[in-house]
């Protein structure tokens, strides 16, 4: 892997640099010297008109530079979710923590560059497009789809396969997102359909093609330990806190953005209660399952995303969150084993239960909201078409990507080396003391022996 991975990664970065040189430019007035005389005259006339309007006491629209700094805090929240939230959520496996958080950083850094180029060209009307704050937010959104899909194949793919999947998935995602927003004119502010459902079913399709019969009965490394679950819970908390920003980042300012924030806030809160209740209910001795708490508590943010900015009452948002928490826990308890043993789809992180089912439920909830007249920017048919497009393009794109990744040239690890950091990372030597400090056989306090 040494030379192949390095060569591919460096070559792709060169391609990114050249692409930015060819297609991307600053949005600010620093480009003024590159504009034609007519463009400069038009800009001066617009500036004079704005100045006259302000002198007359009229409220002028904020400058684009001001919008950049207004949205930058929301972008930072989304950025934290991508790099810290998703990263630590992937550290639950006892011997795959380095890869979970480390490859999350690598794929996100690659994905946001590629996503900027692909989405920018799709939405621009020329060969060059300005680099705005919304380009940065949408680039993070495109990266989120890859990280969701990454969860379905976590521990079973090589770094090179992850790179190939990132490039292909973002291209398919950008095409579907353009279709949903520009052609179908559907409403999906929090991206329940275009990000969560798409990312989940893309990942499941890839996992189905790459299915390993040798893992049908489990793997010794496919389990957590006390501290790995604790690290994963850190990711959950970051995601949970910043999810209102994720769902409101691209909403229209003021009323729509306000609704997106408060609806997500209450949906998440309601989701936590039902997730805890169901987790205790489905376990024989009534104990909580950390897998449910790490994941199902976030399902409310996923499900409410599509209709977050619609004029839905708060109780409707809370109902969406409550149902999403129930669906997610039941999915982890009953559906994941069924997918693995009957449909031959091994979903490492259970992305179908956190992103897939709640994403589909969110799309259906938006159809109900529109039928009640809670939105005038879309129709029931538009929403249904957008949901079908997101799932369909994800499955087809995932199957094609899986077939490409199945080629033997990508250094896919054999079964015995799955879920093991030592394949790709230098890891510390094993110490018996590591296990000693995390024993839970007795309730005796551990004495410090140094």
UniProtKB/Swiss-Prot annotation:
GO terms for biological process: ammonium homeostasis; ammonium transmembrane transport; carbon dioxide transmembrane transport; carbon dioxide transport; erythrocyte development; inorganic cation transmembrane transport; intracellular monoatomic ion homeostasis; methylammonium transmembrane transport. Glycans are attached at residues 31, 41, 52, 58. Glycosylated. One of its GO terms (molecular function) is methylammonium transmembrane transporter activity. Residues 1-4, 94-97, 156-159, 211-229, 282-289, 333-349, 406-450 are cytoplasmic. SUPFAM superfamilies: Ammonium transporter. Belongs to the ammonium transporter (TC 2.A.49) family. Rh subfamily. GO terms for cellular component: ankyrin-1 complex; membrane; plasma membrane. Component of the ankyrin-1 complex, a multiprotein complex involved in the stability and shape of the erythrocyte membrane. Heterotrimer with RHCE (RHAG)2(RHCE), that transports ammonium and its related derivative methylammonium, in both neutral and ionic forms, across the erythrocyte membrane. The transport of NH4(+) is electrogenic and masks the NH3 transport. Also, may act as a CO2 channel. Moreover in erythrocyte, regulates RHD membrane expression and is associated with rhesus blood group antigen expression. It catalyses: methylamine(out) = methylamine(in); NH4(+)(in) = NH4(+)(out); CO2(out) = CO2(in). This is Ammonium transporter Rh type A. It is found in: Membrane. The chain crosses the membrane at residues 5-25, 73-93, 98-118, 135-155, 160-180, 190-210, 230-250, 261-281, 290-307, 312-332, 350-370, 385-405. Homodimer. Heterotrimer; a RHCE monomer interacts with a RHAG homodimer. Component of the ankyrin-1 complex in the erythrocyte, composed of ANK1, RHCE, RHAG, SLC4A1, EPB42, GYPA, GYPB and AQP1. Interacts with GYPB (via the N-terminal); this interaction bridges the (RHAG)2(RHCE) heterotrimer with the SLC4A1 Band 3 I dimer complexed with GYPA. The keyword Metal-binding does not apply. InterPro entries: Ammonium/urea_transptr (IPR029020), NH4_transpt_AmtB-like_dom (IPR024041), RhesusRHD (IPR002229). Residues 26-72, 119-134, 181-189, 251-260, 308-311, 371-384 are extracellular. It is a multi-pass membrane protein. The keyword Hydrolase does not apply. The lineage of its organism: Eukaryota, Metazoa, Chordata, Craniata, Vertebrata.
């Amino acid at each position: 892997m040494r030379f192949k991975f390095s060569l591919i990664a460096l070559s792709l970065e060169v391609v990114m640099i050249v692409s930015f040189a060819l297609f991307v430019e600053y949005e600010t007035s620093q480009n003024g010297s590159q504009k034609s005389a007519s463009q400069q005259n038009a800009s001066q006339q617009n500036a004079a008109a704005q100045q006259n309007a302000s002198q007359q006491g009229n409220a002028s629209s904020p400058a684009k530079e001001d919008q950049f700094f207004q949205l930058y805090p929301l972008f930072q929240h989304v950025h934290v979710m991508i790099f810290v939230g998703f990263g630590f959520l992937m550290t639950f496996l006892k011997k795959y923590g380095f890869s979970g958080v480390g490859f999350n950083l690598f794929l996100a850094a690659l994905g946001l560059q590629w996503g900027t180029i692909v989405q920018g060209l799709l939405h621009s009307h020329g060969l060059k497009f300005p680099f705005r704050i919304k380009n940065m937010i949408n680039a993070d959104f495109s990266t989120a789809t890859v990280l969701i899909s990454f969860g379905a194949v976590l521990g079973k793919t090589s770094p090179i396969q992850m790179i190939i999947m990132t490039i292909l998935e973002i291209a398919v995602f950008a095409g579907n997102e353009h279709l949903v927003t520009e052609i179908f004119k559907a409403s999906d502010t929090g991206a329940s359909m275009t990000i969560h459902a798409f990312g989940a079913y893309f990942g499941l399709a890839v996992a189905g093609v790459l299915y390993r019969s040798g893992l049908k009965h489990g793997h010794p490394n496919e389990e957590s330990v006390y501290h790995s679950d604790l690290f994963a819970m850190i990711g959950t908390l970051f995601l949970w806190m910043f999810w209102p920003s994720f769902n409101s980042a691209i909403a229209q300012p003021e009323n729509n953005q306000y609704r997106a924030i408060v609806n997500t806030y209450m949906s998440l809160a309601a989701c936590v209660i039902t997730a805890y209740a169901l987790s205790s209910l489905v376990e024989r001795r009534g104990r909580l399952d950390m897998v449910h708490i790490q994941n199902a508590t976030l399902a409310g943010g996923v499900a409410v995303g599509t209709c977050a900015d619609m004029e839905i009452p708060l109780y409707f948002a809370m109902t969406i969150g409550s149902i999403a928490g129930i669906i997610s826990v039941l999915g982890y308890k009953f559906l994941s084993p069924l997918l693995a043993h009957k449909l031959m789809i091994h979903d490492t992180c259970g992305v179908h239960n956190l992103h897939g089912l709640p994403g589909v439920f969110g799309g259906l909830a938006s159809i109900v909201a529109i039928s009640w007249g809670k939105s005038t920017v879309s129709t029931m048919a538009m929403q249904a078409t957008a949901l079908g497009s997101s799932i369909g393009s994800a499955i087809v794109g995932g199957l094609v990507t899986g077939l490409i990744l199945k080629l033997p040239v990508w250094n896919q690890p054999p079964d015995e080396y799955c879920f093991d950091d030592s394949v790709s990372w230098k890891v510390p030597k094993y110490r018996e003391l590591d296990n000693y400090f995390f024993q839970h056989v007795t309730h005796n306090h551990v004495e410090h022996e140094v």
